[in-house]
Amino acid sequence: MKLGEFDIQPVTDGRFRLDGGAMFGVVPKVMWERCCQPDDQNRIQLGLNCLLIRIGRKNILLDTGLGDKEDAKFQQMFAIERMPTLRDSLKMEGLQPDDIHMVINTHLHFDHAGGNTVREDGAVVSTFPKAKYIVQRGEYEDAARANERTRASYRRENFTPIAHVDQWEFVDGETEVLPGVTVMVTEGHTRCHQSIKIESEGQVAFYLGDLIPTVSHLPLPYIMGYDLYPLQTLETKRWVLDRALNENWLLVFEHDPRVLMGRVRKDVEGKFYLEEVKP
């Protein structure tokens, strides 16, 4: 779809499942299961919705999904459905890995950066060899020195091979990485999580990452148990949603399995809801 001078298109890396309780934190199951039906292992289905941005001859990719390096045990644990993969989705858009000029990671958890690298001839290498990969410097540092709480989410094979070939470009805070494409720190899920603002001709799209992973997480207290700083998530959500409402932003949801994007509104009780926009 057109957004001013940009063309933006969701590209999927498939679907997977995570524990519903972890996805909704302190929200009781009796409330969250109204919108997200769990399976017999209490897992809910989630999308892997990356975003392709095109302007002129440049192709920018926001997040890279899970990738395909993991073994059968990992795939079973997370009930991964890989039809299609991200590379399949890009191919349907007429693109090969060499055609991607920039990859922006919201953060480096395995379901957002797993497709950064690929296994070839027994080695793990960059999936997009001609791209600059962009992430907050603090996020990379936290991933590189992950602790007992965070280690399961950060898998070194998703980011260290890119450092070996000097494809990383680290940013510190809000940065316009291309004219009209700005990364903004939206801390809470991680210390240096970032979301991406795309702006052209008075129109704005905002790729949320894990700040608001699904439409079901629009209510302010609906915060993931995975978030390292949940009270910061609360405040970040508040200002993002208020600004999105006042400025009519198009919000893009990375993990919703059904709704990809929409514009936030408020009902008579002052609660946020979404008007879906089809891409």
Name what the model sees in each region.
Residues 114-130:
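Conserved nucleotide-sugar donor-interacting segment of glycosyltransferase catalytic cores
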Residues 81-95, 99-111, 127-185, 235-248:
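Metallo-beta-lactamase
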Residues 36-41, 121-122, 183-184:
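Short, P/G- and charge-enriched loop/turn segments at secondary-structure junctions
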Residues 77-88, 201-279:
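Cap/insert and terminal regions of metallo-dependent hydrolase folds
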Residues 60-62, 104, 133, 205-207, ...:
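Residue-level marker for buried hydrophobic side chains located in beta-strands
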Residues 13-15, 64-67, 108, 138-139, ...:
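Active-site metal-binding loops of divalent metal-dependent hydrolases
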Residues 2-8, 12-93, 195-210:
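Conserved beta-strand hairpin/beta-sheet module of binuclear metal-dependent hydrolase folds
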